[in-house]
Design a protein with these regions (language model features):
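Active-site-facing alpha/beta catalytic cores
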Residues: 2-5, 72, 85-240, 244-245, ...
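Glycine-rich phosphate/diphosphate-binding loops that line cofactor/substrate pockets in enzymes
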Residues: 43-51, 253-257, 351
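Conserved, mostly hydrophobic/aromatic
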Residues: 58, 263, 329
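Gly-rich Lys/Arg/Thr-decorated short loops/hinges at beta-loop-alpha junctions or inter-strand turns
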Residues: 17-26, 222-234, 317
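N- or domain-start disorder-to-order transition segments that initiate the globular core
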Residues: 7-46
Length: 351
């Protein structure tokens, strides 16, 4: 008899179950309050019951937890300064989609050396999320792998489905059962209809195969997620202008979806030039100041230090500097947050 399975699997290593990790690192009362309130507030902003703007801001990816906590402490201070205008959520990304190959993130390879200590990565990721939430600062992340949410989702206030996975059925099913609001990005080439389709799918109940926190295969029955929205991240060209907002709103309206839009200032909208986020921010603040209410959120790729660096020389990494996409620095981040807060105040005065 011929062997017909696992022909291209060279090894297998079991990982800790989600239930074991959650037992070892339980969510605190403080963190649960942070997550609960942030999800409620985001939902209200999305549905325009709250006049503020949601801002998901932080490093492209997390590779150094000390720098991440340093950043979180700074961001918490800013969130208190602008609590009447902005709902600030820290971008805490542990998984990186790759166009071909490359470092897949802290969970997959926490030591940055291709050792793939995923147990360690899951533990580090969960501990960091606990620490950030205990500060009273909510965390947002991209759900790339459909199993890892079992390990961290109770500590996530907002989630994203990326441009490469918005069309994926399993990610739409995941979103439909998610306890937190979910943003779907437009496609890598800029198409918004796929995101509208994803929102429409996630609104509905689904039955799908997944893995329980104990590590057993099971059929999950989701009830649908009413707190889903589109994220404009650009594509073959930027899509944050007023004309793009109008076009996106028309697509949402024609699909009987709420005209609530988040703009990603990075990626295709910055033409992958991190300083261009400041140009995008200026345009968005002008729109908001003029009374644009359909923009309910923004995303910013930001770090302590500007730009990015290679992770090949681990002994000489610059503290607080990205090893994936280039980010704006902390001073520019504060400028953006101030501009956004002033724009929200101006919009409120018009209303």
């Amino acid at each position: 008899m011929h062997k017909t399975s696992d022909l291209r699997i060279s090894d297998r290593q079991e990982v800790i179950s989600a239930s074991s990790l959650l037992s070892d690192q339980p969510i605190s009362k403080e963190s649960s309050e942070t997550v609960y309130q942030a999800r409620e507030n985001f939902s209200k902003i999305l549905n325009k019951e709250d006049h503020r703007l949601s801002v998901v801001v932080g490093p492209c990816s997390i590779h150094d937890t000390l720098a991440a906590i340093d950043y979180a402490g700074r961001l918490k201070e800013e969130s208190l300064n602008y609590e009447d205008q902005l709902q600030i959520i820290m971008r805490v990304y542990f998984e990186k989609p790759r166009t071909t190959v490359g470092w897949k993130g802290l969970i997959n390879d926490p030591d940055l050396n291709d050792s793939f200590q995923i147990d360690k990565g899951l533990s580090i990721a969960r501990q960091l999320l606990r620490d950030i939430n205990d500060l009273g600062l909510p965390a947002g992340t991209e759900f790339l792998d459909v199993i890892t949410p079992q390990y961290i989702a109770d500590l996530i206030s907002w989630g994203a489905i990326g441009a490469r996975t918005t069309e994926s059925q399993v990610h739409r099913e995941l979103a439909s059962g998610s306890s937190c609001p979910i943003g779907f990005k437009n496609s890598t080439y800029g198409g918004v209809q796929v995101a509208a389709d994803a929102i429409g799918s996630a609104l509905n109940p689904h039955k799908f195969l997944s893995v329980t926190k104990e590590g057993r295969a099971a059929v999950f029955y989701s009830s649908g997620n009413k707190d889903c929205h589109v994220i404009l991240r650009g594509g073959s060209k930027p899509n944050y202008s007023k004309e793009d907002i109008d076009a996106t709103a028309e697509i949402l309206k024609s699909n009987n979806l709420a005209e609530s839009i988040m703009v990603d200032m990075s990626h295709g909208n910055s033409s992958k030039q991190h300083k261009n986020q400041l140009i995008v921010c200026e345009d968005i603040t002008n729109q908001i100041s003029s009374g644009e209410s359909r923009i309910t959120g923004v995303m910013i790729e930001s770090n302590i230090e500007e730009g990015n660096q290679s992770a090949k020389d681990l002994d000489n990494l610059v503290y607080g500097k990205s090893i994936t996409d280039a980010c704006i620095n902390w001073e520019d981040t504060k400028t953006c947050l101030n501009q956004l807060a002033e724009a929200v105040s101006a919009r409120e005065n018009i209303a």
